[in-house]
Every structure is written in C-alpha cells, then in structure tokens.
Amino acid sequence: MKIAACDFDGTLFRDGAVSGADLEAIAVWRRSGNAFGIVTGRGRNTLLRDVERFNIPYDFLICNNGAMICDEQAQDVYCAVLPEAVRAGIMDHPGMRASSQCAFFAGTSIFTHAGKTDYWIVKDHILPRLSPAEALHLPGLHQISLAYAEPGESAAWSEAFTEGCGESAGVHFSNICIDITAPDVSKAAGMEHLLHLRRWGEAEDVLVIGDDMNDLPMIRHFNGYAVANAAPDVRAASSAVFPSVGQMLRERG
C-alpha cells in the first residue's frame, strides 16, 4: 500500500475549485488499495466545508498544520494543545494587534477574536466570538491563526513571532496567514503521527505534495513534490514538480 497526502489551498483546491481530473485520480488511487488524505493549515470544519462541497474522498485529514489528526470519518484521533503560557504571549504580541483577523481552533470548534472580525477568511461564515481572556483558558485550544492585509506583512510578523516565541511554539507562515501551534507541530510531524497511529510504518511509499512555505517540512522530510504554481523555495526543495495532484497520483501510482 502507498500513502498520498496533499496540501489543500493552492495544491488540490485551486482557483476556487477541485478539478474533476484530480477527483478521478484520487478515486483510482484508492480503488487500487492505496490511502489518500489532506494535510492543511485549515481547521477541520473549514476544511470539511469544501471537502463535502466537492465530494473529495479521503482516508485521513491532518489539520491545523499537524496539530489535529482525523480519521476517515472526520473524527479527531490526535490533538496537540497549545500551552496557556504560550497563548498569553501571543495575545500580548504586537503582531496580534496588527492582524486584521484572528481565529482560535479548539477541538473541532472555531472561534474568532471578539475585538476583530466575526469571520475567518470567508465573510459569509459568521463564527462565535471569544475575548482574549476566554481564549487563554479555552480547553483544547491547539491553533491561533492570524491574517494580515498582504503576504509581505504576514511574512514580517512571522519572523517576529518566531523570534519572540523561540522554541515554545510552532510558527507556520502561508500567504496572508500565520498559524501558531504547540512546539514540534508541523505537517511532517503530523504525517509521522498518522503513520504511527494507523500502523502504516511499512507502507511501500509515502507521497506528499504542496505549494507554500508551511509545506516545506513535510516535503523535505518525505522527499516530496511541489505543484507547478508553488512558491520558488518550495519548488527548489521538491524532488519533482507536477502540474497537479492528480498527475502525481497517476505517475506514482
């Protein structure tokens, strides 16, 4: 059996859609006895919204940059909680004040910062709100996500958070967003946890593919791939570049 995992936004989900060719390739891959899943910075519920819309079949979901793992029924089987001391530092950081949006992911729930927008990225999905004090003690909080006006701003704040948090947290940068998790959380670590949980350590091959900076750890760890529209650093780190997820599955199946 082979295992394939792809990033979602910019990799499988491009230009607001998932292509029919990619969906067919995923179906053929799974009919051949292989496993397929998604590894994303999104939370479970925001991911499922589009997974269900496009009827994407899957055997696992790795969400929030590896902080949460879900099975084939979208039930969570692993979660790395963000320590309260780290949360406090993030709440007081200038990068928090500079962000235009903020979301708190806890278990399978998502909340927004009471002092910012009442949505996360998608304006027509209104979410419940929390004050920073409530988020500080929220059970199961495993990711704080911040959004900025443009990628250059988020890149600069990502460096500031990385310097400020040191080894106490994981800082993941992708486009206009920064996601902050417990230390040692990454898409690579999430994949390793998955392989252990599902007892897939003897899999014939593990294929991963992505497009942005938060995909680099898993691409480097698994000698993985990039899609053609990936960031230059991601393409440079990959062992091959494919035009789509489906093409990777067809060629490596």
Residue positions per predicted region:
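Active-site phosphate-binding/coordination module
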Residues: 20-118
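Residue-level signal for inorganic ion chemistry
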Residues: 29, 65, 144, 219, ...
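Asp-based, Mg2+/Mn2+-dependent phosphohydrolase catalytic module
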Residues: 220, 224-253
